[in-house]
Regions:
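Serine-esterase "nucleophile elbow" of acetyl-processing enzymes
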Residues: 1-52, 223, 228-229
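Alpha-helical cap/lid subdomain in secreted, periplasmic
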Residues: 46-243
Length: 243
């Protein structure tokens, strides 16, 4: 059975996250990407699932609703400035996960950050992409709607191909926002789908390890040992039940 993992930096890199512990027992492809939002995560896992005919299970970790991704090619006003670095974690190409995205002719910018006001790994990305969006376009309701639509998109894809899927959030996310009528309806649809939902990674680690809430609030990640405990006690048993 093939396991396809998706997510942000809470999933990226088998050596540092829960995905590595799962990979010890299963054939796993890790599509996790640093700074990824839920739009990028959805695209990446659908792209990878589409390469396999059968016998796959999706384990997808969802990220912050404030995060977005933007398509970049040589025609983009900021292209020359953006490609000046080497392998920045805010750039991604889910079709070539083992190559430097900014060396490709086209790639994606991932805004990252712990919330809409706190920069991620790059002040440049925050100033060019996040600040203008936050000033003129951002709303919690629209971000909820778009994230839930991305989750539904993955769920519908899995349903159409009868792919079993497991999902969880990076930490408490939806609980931080008040849903309005648009997002409430979508959330009800999400819960109706044939998905195994797990407790979010951050909350589980706070309840079962020495991770503190303030660490998560400050943008820190669970340690490798905490990730491994979550994998052994939560993710792997859930996978076993589906096999």
């Amino acid at each position: 059975m093939k396991i396809i993992a998706g997510g942000c930096s809470f999933t990226y890199n088998n050596e540092m996250t829960w995905a590595g512990e799962v990979a010890k027992e299963h054939d796993l492809t890790n599509m996790g990407s640093c700074a990824a939002g839920n739009d990028y995560i959805a695209r990446s896992v659908i792209h990878e699932m589409d390469k396999h005919e059968s016998n796959i299970i999706l384990v997808c970790q969802w990220s912050g609703i404030h995060r977005r991704s933007y398509y970049i090619n040589h025609q983009h006003t900021l292209h020359r400035d953006l490609v000046s670095g080497d392998w920045p974690d805010w750039a991604g190409d889910y079709t070539r996960i083992n190559e430097d995205a900014v060396k490709q002719q086209e790639f994606w910018i991932k805004t990252g950050g712990n919330n809409i006001s706190k920069p991620g790994s790059s002040d440049r990305i925050h100033n060019f992409f996040v600040k203008p969006y936050a000033k003129y376009f951002y709303s919690e309701e629209q971000s909820l709607v778009e994230s839930l639509e991305n989750i539904l998109r993955v769920q519908y894809y899995c349903s159409s191909r009868k792919i079993q899927n497991i999902m969880f959030w990076w930490k408490k996310e939806l609980e931080n926002y008040e849903m309005s009528r648009y997002s409430k309806q979508l959330y009800e649809q999400v819960l109706k789908q044939n998905t195994v939902w797990l407790e979010d990674l951050g909350s589980w680690c706070i309840e079962n390890t020495d991770l503190l809430q303030k660490d998560l609030d400050e943008g820190n990640h669970p340690t490798l040992e905490q990730h491994q405990s979550y994998a052994r006690q939560v993710v792997l048993p859930s996978i076993s039940k589906l096999m």
